[in-house]
């Protein structure tokens, strides 16, 4: 387990699958592979360029993305040491979006707030994130 004070050299992967993504294409560029994957549009807001995603538990950086797709670059070491070497177009893979992005999204107006009856989160969502909200919650 990661201890408080330990160096975090990547992104936090909880191991919870958010959805299935489908490998749409794999293109070789030099020694690397560029993989394009499609996923349900509902997860689009949690995927950002240069952000992180876990695909089949492999922590990767997102190159580009849209409402229902993303691309990642797979270096030779990752190709050899992970199950991604089994990927081919049409294969489904487990996708986990970044946990920090989920927390940020939850605070935005129109998000999926209140799922756990969290009044504080719902209040942030209905009013948006304001200076008063941040002051009242210890951010200043």
Language-model features and meaning:
Residues 1-140:
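Structural preference for solvent-exposed beta-strand-turn elements
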């Amino acid at each position: 387990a990661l201890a408080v004070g330990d160096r975090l050299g990547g992104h936090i992967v909880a191991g919870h699958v958010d959805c299935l993504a489908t490998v749409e294409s794999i293109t070789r560029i030099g020694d690397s592979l560029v993989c394009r994957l499609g996923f349900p549009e509902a997860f689009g807001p949690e995927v950002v360029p240069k952000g992180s995603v876990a695909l089949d538990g492999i922590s990767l950086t997102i190159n580009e993305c849209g409402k229902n797709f993303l691309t990642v670059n797979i270096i030779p070491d990752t190709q050899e040491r992970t199950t991604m070497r089994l990927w081919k177009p049409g294969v489904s893979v487990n996708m986990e979006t970044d946990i920090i992005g989920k927390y940020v999204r939850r605070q935005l107006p129109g998000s999926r707030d209140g799922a756990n009856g969290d009044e504080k989160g719902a209040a942030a969502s209905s009013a948006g994130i304001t200076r008063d909200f941040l002051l009242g919650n210890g951010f200043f």
